[in-house]
Amino acid sequence: NRRSFNDAVDTMVRQAALTGDRAVTLIMADIDHFKQVNDFNGHNTGDRLLQECAKRITGCLPSQALVSRIGGDEFAVAVEFDRNRADRIDGIAASLVEAIAQSATINAISIEVTASIGLARSDSLARGGTLPDSRTLLEMADIAMYHSKRQGRNSYFWFEAPMADEMRFRNELEYGIRKGVARGEFVPFYEQQIDLQTGELTGFE
């Protein structure tokens, strides 16, 4: 479950830091448009698709990696790596994107599936000798994952601080709009659409 995964990640981060040259990457993978698969094909098909995706994810990982399904269509992965060979993690992430994107045939139904993936590394989030805990890594990887979705899905991105600022701005903007609508602070204005041939009013925008 999620708690045992978090505990295992915290242990992995501490042990990696002791070596001085190793760190941990937290990878979040979200299956794109999974709700549509459930809605159109039923929960049984959706569950089998998740099982297939879990198999594909595991097949791309080194044996010591930690894997957990932490949400309806979200998987979390923790991988220890050599800090001087971070490119290997890029290779894993690219393999995950490619493996998940293979069409799946379930209950005689062909399903096109992709994933949005976000990554965060423990060494880049350490502050003043304090290591990030699993919750922080999950949060940062989650932010990077949603950035991937906004960039068109079926891709992966490493967490960068501006992503958090952008998400915070979006959340504050959405909250402000919802509050404004409830208070009646928005006044709509409509521009007339005129047929240039006849001069008649045809609509508004």
Model regions and ranges:
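Structural alpha-helical segments in enzyme catalytic/regulatory domains
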Residues: 14, 95, 172-185, 200-202
